[in-house]
């Protein structure tokens, strides 16, 4: 029986080009997971979009002397190009400035307000006296009070991932003027997290199979006591507050409305497909499963704050899992577009086959700890594992068949050696599938590549290029077995490398069309043409 699987993926700020850390942190893992669930027959809804209200956008707009919408339009278009080139299979990739999103944000705000989970409170907010304006949290930088990182932002420290308020920073400085920030009293709406603390704590205790760094952090955060958090700010750029109690110059704070985007994107998908109630299959159906693919800096918002909002709103599904990745490091530093650490994604896509890039990243996913990635290691994997092992295997078998047989004859009389190889593959799909379902994506790819090695070993041991000189029938059996195994390898590798896997699958005529399993190869017909799958780097 098929299941409804919601794959919710972090919303990138439309403020700058992406890098490998973003792709390996959230978007590639989500796509691997979604593609697997589709091929086994589950109903997948994969959603995200460009976050257009984050303060990094206004910071960039100020620096370039343009309007925030100009920055948004530029980078949203750029992101769409990335997803197309990398074959990221969105069901809906949208933005946080659609009418649907604003309506859903207002609905949740009003519902929580009516339930007493939102109230007005006075607080101190960073202020730049020389500019005569309040400063959004990301306009403030200083030293982290927890780890002493010198470039911590007013909302979070990139080094230790602690969420912060600007007044906690040591020597907080305005990014606009460079002057020390002052703090002035202002009034805002706050989300009363304390009201759902007990219920949230009980829910977290039910979560099994989460990555240790996610569940341990979430439990620790709640154990320390949840503090009410401001959900509005003194801003010009953002979603309007649906009530007028605070006066002008106030907007909904991005961290509150961005996570609501998963729900609004699902509703928008249903509207686009003329099935306005279809979103309920993933949000109201108690049997549905929801997975949030994010980086570790987003754990507070997805493992604590978003579940708190959902608990307060009531009746919507809570996360099944939040498989947050840690950081991809470049020469010991977190990859960062804003700080220029690591190449941009455009630079890699100009040089790499997108599937090869997906493979290199998937081989180094930072699932349990920060993961160093170097271009030399990526090139080694491409040359040794894709070109020499997988791509060469396909070419060897295809060329042997084309050079020696007009077509493969009907198969029978397979040896124990042949049947043993094919039986190994029958087990592989269950083992690797279980690993993917646990979001163990790096190890499941390693396991899949072991089967490429098995086929190469089988081919080297059986030597059909020699056997054909004395026993053409036996050589045909060997190549039939190898071709069956290659088709199975393409199925195993499809979630990771969809484009090249489809090229292989489409070139092999089959009597069955299993997308996740071993197929019966059609005999008596010619193979379709297939070119080189990957290029070697010098």
Regions found by a protein language model. Name each.
Residues 1-4, 45, 49, 121-131, ...:
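Basic, alpha-helical terminal appendages of large translation-related enzymes
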Residues 53, 341, 424-429, 485:
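N-terminal alpha-helical segment
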Residues 2-48, 100-104, 170-403, 444-448:
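Structured secondary-structure scaffolds
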Residues 104-111, 258-261, 389-400, 431, ...:
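Alpha-helical scaffold segments in carbohydrate-active enzymes
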Residues 1-203:
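N-terminal, positively charged nucleic-acid-binding surface of large information/translation enzymes
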Residues 138-150, 293, 372-386, 427-446:
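Extended, non-catalytic structural segments that build the interaction scaffolds
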Residues 299, 361-364, 368, 374, ...:
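Active-site-proximal binding-pocket segments
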Residues 32, 70, 74-81, 107, ...:
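A non-catalytic, amphipathic alpha-helix used as a structural packing/dimerization or gating element
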